[in-house]
């Protein structure tokens, strides 16, 4: 259908790809045999059921108390506290943040590309103010979150049918879901009508693009599937939707898409599907994979250890090259789409440009589980163990995910 401006919305992308009908990307051409697939689906159904704990998207009551303890101790030599100060001083984390939107339509490109910088700041502010609320209990942060979200809910009509629509939906549906989850489950003055309004925006504007991604043939680099899946899992928890949650699990463990764990990360070396593309996108992808694992972990499911700690291997490979080591193996493989198979060397583009993703993985594999991640540690050492804002939804991760003082 068209709006009065002539911009096309919600046309199934398979119409743009030449396919006659949508294909379920979750199950198409699985590498598993039929018997293994049945076993896998049975395992997924029985073992990967969310606890539906609230709050429960990236953070639960225990991790919130841990963050509050770090702030209360105010140890100036603690990187977690130093990272908290960086977060607190970010303009997007201020309760007096000045909203730049809202807009009727938002996009990353073409006619509405001019909105991108502003809505990214607005949704980033909702995310960071939600964190500041659960840490400080200063009501001004909770009200700022709901101001941002409800104003967008009142005005936002759609995401134009551009190439990046699904990626946009993945990034920002997650930020919105996280912010709404943190405030709606912990702030007793919230108005249910406001919560309903924001949920309607998520269902009517963002969710159709996420569903669309799952219903079409694979077409993108792997970070897309991981970003979409993180948003889908977050919405599943927000809405207490076990089937949505399990759909995400099936995709990341068994999906025929560059964004599933086994298609994104080589089981032998940890090389990632985008390692030959550039280091910015591969860090984006592996960070999204790590955050999916953390969301599931907070819901009682261990994706971190899945496929023999596959996500850890991806982190270590990526950290090793980005910290400066050249002796990393590289092989050219045929990706799921066949479009991104020409890379014959690891890419030096954006090499060493640190993204705030490594503290998350180090916290789980080393602090919680006692495993070794020498290259991830080297990356953190090189960057003084400080997190930062990347807009990737695990910003300031050294503060957010640091369980060294807890018995995990």
Indicate residue ranges for each PLM-predicted region:
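Secondary-structure capping and boundary motifs in well-ordered enzyme cores
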Residues: 168, 224, 278-285, 307-310
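Active-site-adjacent structural elements in folded domains
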Residues: 112-113, 209-220, 260-278
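Amphipathic alpha-helical repeat scaffolds
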Residues: 130-131, 230, 234
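A structural motif
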Residues: 203, 244-265, 283-286
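Extracellular glycan-targeting catalytic surfaces
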Residues: 27, 31-215, 250, 273, ...
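Bacterial Sec-dependent N-terminal signal peptides
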Residues: 1-29
């Amino acid at each position: 259908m068209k709006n009065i401006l002539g911009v096309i919305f919600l046309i199934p992308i398979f119409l743009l790809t030449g396919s006659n009908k949508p294909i379920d990307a979750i199950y198409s051409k699985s590498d598993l045999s039929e018997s293994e697939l049945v076993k896998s689906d049975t395992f997924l159904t029985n073992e990967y059921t969310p606890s539906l704990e609230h709050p429960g998207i990236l953070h639960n009551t225990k991790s919130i108390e841990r963050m509050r303890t770090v702030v209360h101790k105010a140890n100036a030599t603690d990187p977690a506290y130093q990272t908290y100060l960086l977060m607190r001083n970010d303009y997007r984390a201020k309760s007096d943040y000045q909203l730049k939107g809202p807009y009727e339509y938002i996009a990353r490109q073409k006619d509405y590309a001019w909105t991108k910088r502003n809505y990214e700041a607005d949704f980033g502010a909702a995310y960071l103010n939600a964190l500041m609320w659960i840490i400080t209990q200063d009501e001004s942060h909770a009200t700022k979150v709901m101001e941002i979200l409800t104003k967008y809910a009142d005005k936002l009509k759609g995401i134009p049918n551009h190439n990046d629509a699904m990626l946009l939906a993945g990034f920002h549906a997650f930020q919105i879901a996280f912010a709404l989850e943190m405030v709606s489950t912990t702030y007793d003055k919230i108005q249910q009508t406001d919560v309903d309004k924001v949920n309607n925006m998520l269902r009517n504007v963002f969710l159709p693009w996420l569903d669309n991604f799952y219903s079409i043939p694979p077409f993108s680099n792997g970070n897309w599937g991981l970003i979409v899946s993180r948003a889908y899992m977050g919405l599943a928890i927000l809405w207490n939707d076990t089937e949505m949650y399990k759909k995400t699990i099936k995709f990341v463990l068994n999906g025929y898409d560059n964004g599933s764990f086994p298609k994104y990360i080589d089981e032998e070396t940890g090389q990632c599907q985008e390692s030959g593309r550039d280091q910015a996108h591969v860090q984006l992808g592996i960070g999204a994979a790590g955050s999916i694992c953390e969301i599931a972990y907070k819901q009682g499911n261990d994706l971190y250890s899945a496929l023999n700690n596959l996500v850890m291997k991806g982190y270590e490979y990526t950290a090793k090259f980005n910290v400066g080591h050249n002796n990393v193996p590289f092989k050219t493989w045929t990706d799921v789409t066949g479009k991104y198979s020409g890379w014959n060397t690891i890419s030096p583009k954006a090499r060493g440009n640190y993204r705030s993703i490594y503290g998350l993985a180090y916290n789980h594999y080393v602090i919680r589980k006692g495993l070794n991640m020498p290259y991830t540690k080297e990356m953190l050492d090189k960057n003084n163990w400080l997190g930062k804002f990347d807009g990737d939804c695990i910003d300031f991760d050294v503060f957010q995910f640091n369980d060294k003082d807890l018995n995990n």
